C-alpha cells in the first residue's frame, strides 16, 4: 500500500554535507524517508492512535484543562516520554555510532537498505495497532465496570430507602456495607492494605467477619445477603422487592468478577514479547539503514521514528493494567469518593466527603 502524499519544497542541504555523496539534498532525503516510512507512520497513527482514543473516558488519572496546541507539544507529566527517555538516548547513541562507522563498514561491502525496514515497519504497525486496541479495550471495560458499580449501588440504596421508610438504622447499615465494598475492591485491585477504610466504614457487628476474611469483597457481599435475609424474615420486604434487591447484589458480584478477570488475565506474554523484541530490533538497526542517505541527520530522524514506535508500545503496556498507579490508569480513589458522596447524599448524611482534585501535576489517584 502506497500513499501519495505531497512533498513540500525544502531548503537545500548545507553544502559541507555534500561531501558524503555527490548530488545529495535534503529534499531527496525527505522524499526517500517519506516513501519508506509513510506506511509505517500513517498506519500506526491512524489505526493505533485512533482506536486507542476513539472513546472518551472520564476521571482519568491525568486531568488536564484544554491547552493550546503548541503548549501541548511540551507536556511532560502524563506523557510516556519520561519512561522511554533512556531508550531514546540509546537510539541516539546507536545513530552516532552508525554515522561514525559508516565509511568503515561501507568499505567492507556491507549495504543495509531501507527496503526490509519498510516491510518490517508495516508488520510492527499492524501488531502495535492490535496491541493498543486490546489494551484500551481492557481500560474501557474496567471503567465500564466501575461506572456500573456506581449505578447499581445508587439503584440499590434507592430501592431499600423507599422500602424501609421508617428504619434509618438499617438503611445506614447496608449503605455502609456498600461503601466498604467499593474501598475493599479498590485495595484488592491495587494490592494495598484496606484495613483503615474498612474500620472507618464497617458497622461494628460485621468487623470480625469481614476483617478476618482473606477475601473481604466476597465477605461483604455475603453480609449484604445476610442483611437482606434479615429484613425479609422481619416481613418488611416483600418477595418481589427481595428479588429485585438480590438481583442488584448479584450485579455487584458480577462487577467484582469482571475486575478480577482483568487483573488475573493479562494479554498473552508471548504476544507482547514478540512485539517488544521486534520494536527494539527495528529501532536499534534503523540508524544503519538511514545513514547512507541522511548522514548527520540520522540521529534526528532515527530518534523521531523510534519515539513513535516505543511510545505506542509503552502506552499499550501501561493501559494493560487499568487498575494500577501509572499516569494513565483509572483513579480508583476518586471513583470511591464519588460513589461514597452519592450514597451519603441519597440518605441525607451530611456533610459529604470532599471530592478528590488533581494535584499540581494534574494527577488524580
Which residues fall in each region the model found?
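Short helix-terminus and kink motifs of transmembrane alpha helices
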Residues: 130-138, 143, 147, 218, ...
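Intracellular alpha-helical coupling/juxtamembrane segments of multi-pass membrane proteins
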Residues: 139-156, 248-256, 262, 326-329, ...
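Structured inter-helical modules in multipass membrane proteins
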Residues: 159-269
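Alpha-helical transmembrane anchor segments
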Residues: 95-96, 100-106, 115-117, 127-131, ...
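N-terminal juxtamembrane/topogenic regions of multi-pass membrane proteins
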Residues: 53-147, 166, 294-296, 341, ...
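Short, C-terminally biased terminal segments at protein or domain edges
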Residues: 1-49
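Solvent-exposed, non-transmembrane helices and loops of integral membrane proteins
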Residues: 153-182, 188, 323-365
Amino acid at each position: 500500500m502506497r500513499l501519495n502524499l505531497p512533498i513540500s519544497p525544502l531548503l537545500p542541504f548545507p553544502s559541507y554535507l555534500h561531501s558524503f555523496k555527490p548530488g545529495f539534498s535534503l529534499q531527496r532525503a525527505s522524499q526517500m524517508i517519506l516513501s519508506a516510512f509513510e506506511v509505517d507512520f500513517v498506519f500506526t497513527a491512524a489505526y493505533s492512535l485512533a482506536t486507542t482514543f476513539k472513546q472518551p473516558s472520564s476521571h482519568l488519572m491525568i486531568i488536564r484543562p484544554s491547552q493550546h496546541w503548541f503548549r501541548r507539544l511540551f507536556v511532560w507529566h502524563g506523557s510516556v516520554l519520561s519512561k522511554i527517555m533512556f531508550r531514546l538516548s540509546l537510539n541516539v547513541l546507536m545513530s552516532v555510532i552508525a554515522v561514525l562507522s559508516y565509511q568503515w563498514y561501507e568499505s567492507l561491502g556491507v549495504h543495509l537498505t531501507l527496503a526490509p525496514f519498510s516491510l518490517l515497519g508495516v508488520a510492527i504497525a499492524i501488531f502495535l495497532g492490535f496491541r493498543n486496541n486490546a489494551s484500551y479495550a481492557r481500560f474501557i471495560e474496567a471503567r465500564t465496570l466501575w461506572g456500573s458499580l456506581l449505578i447499581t449501588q445508587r439503584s440499590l440504596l434507592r430501592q431499600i430507602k423507599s422500602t424501609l421508610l421508617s428504619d434509618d438504622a438499617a438503611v445506614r447499615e447496608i449503605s455502609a456495607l456498600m461503601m466498604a465494598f467499593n474501598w475493599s475492591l479498590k485495595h484488592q485491585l491495587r494490592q494495598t492494605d484496606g484495613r483503615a477504610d474498612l474500620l472507618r466504614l464497617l458497622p461494628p457487628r460485621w468487623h470480625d467477619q469481614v476483617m478476618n476474611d482473606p477475601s473481604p469483597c466476597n465477605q461483604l457481599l455475603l453480609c449484604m445477603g445476610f442483611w437482606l435475609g434479615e429484613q425479609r424474615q422481619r416481613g418488611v420486604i416483600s418477595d418481589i422487592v427481595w428479588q429485585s434487591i438480590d438481583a442488584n447484589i448479584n450485579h455487584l458480584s458480577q462487577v467484582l468478577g469482571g475486575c478480577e478477570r482483568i487483573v488475573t488475565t493479562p494479554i498473552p506474554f508471548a504476544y507482547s514479547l514478540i512485539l517488544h523484541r521486534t520494536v527494539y530490533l527495528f529501532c536499534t538497526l534503523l540508524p544503519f539503514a538511514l545513514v547512507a542517505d541522511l548522514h548527520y541527520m540520522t540521529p534526528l530522524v532515527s530518534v523521531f521514528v523510534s519515539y513513535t514506535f516505543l511510545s505506542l508500545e509503552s502506552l499499550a503496556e501501561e493501559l494493560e493494567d487499568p487498575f494500577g498507579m501509572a499516569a494513565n490508569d483509572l483513579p480508583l480513589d476518586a471513583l470511591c469518593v464519588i460513589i461514597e458522596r452519592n450514597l451519603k447524599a441519597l440518605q441525607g448524611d451530611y456533610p459529604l466527603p470532599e471530592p478528590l482534585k488533581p494535584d499540581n501535576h494534574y494527577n488524580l489517584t
